[in-house]
Amino acid sequence: MKNPIKWAIIAVLLSTVVAKKIVGEGMADVSAIKHPEEVHPTNRDFLRSLIFSISMIFGCEIGDKTFIVAALLAFENSRLTVFAGSYSALFIMTLLGVLLGHAAPLLFPRKLTDILGGVLFVIFGIKMLMEAKEVMDSKESMSDEFQNVRNEIAANGPIDQLLEEGAAPSHYTGHRSRSGHTLMSQLKSKGRNVMATLFSPLFIKAFALTFVSEWGDRSQIATIAMAASDNVYGVFMGANVGHACCTALAVISGKYISTKIKVHKVMFIGGILFIAFGLVYFYQGFF
């Protein structure tokens, strides 16, 4: 889905929530008091929601731009710092998506949110299948995707210079106080080094690149749809577990995976998963 359409979907959802707050308490709130189980589908199977969201994230993120960004940044830099920066951005995006999806049943009937979720998943699934066919016909490999993302990053400045900025500030490295032999001073020194590493320019760069890449992405919109129709706690936990696994996979073995994975196969599997999820939500909405 093109970026303007993605932004439009998110804008509509956000504006609806804001309008709800401005107008005040409406019929949806009355319904929530009388029939709370029909508004927030938290009584739905937690395990199913967990599995659905993990599968959705894997289908979206393996080989996606955020995956490639993490892999590229981790090639010659601290994997821990890259993981922390990338995952922090994904965690925040997941939280925003889940909160927005959780608000949807207060604005629309539950069956309608199920049907709308089904429509989104089917559309995304069909689009992924079409993209998979295009990639297969063009014989584009994962290595080509890596190069494309590398070029995008390099467009903002030389890639080597951008990555070198992630070095921890020198004044933190090797710092020891006069009482450095005491346990407390050693703990303080290690704490400063850890903070300098985690919140270094590399951390900020990984966070920013991931946040920008993920905003309005297919996985974020899918998370909103799932949170609106399924157990919100299961979706939140599953999405974060999926993001953690995919990001860890990217920073640990992204370069190796790029030579083994076929882009069109990943997109094909993701498309099938999305269509299957859509059918499940259609069933919930109509029956």
Swiss-Prot record:
One of its GO terms (cellular component) is Golgi apparatus. It is a multi-pass membrane protein. Keywords: Membrane, Transmembrane, Transmembrane helix. InterPro entries: GDT1-like, GDT1-like_CS. GO terms for molecular function: calcium ion transmembrane transporter activity; calcium:proton antiporter activity; manganese ion transmembrane transporter activity. It is found in: Membrane. Its main location: membrane. The chain crosses the membrane at residues 7-27, 50-70, 89-109, 112-132, 194-214, 232-252, 267-287. One of its GO terms (biological process) is Golgi calcium ion homeostasis. Belongs to the GDT1 family. This is GDT1-like protein C17G8.08c.
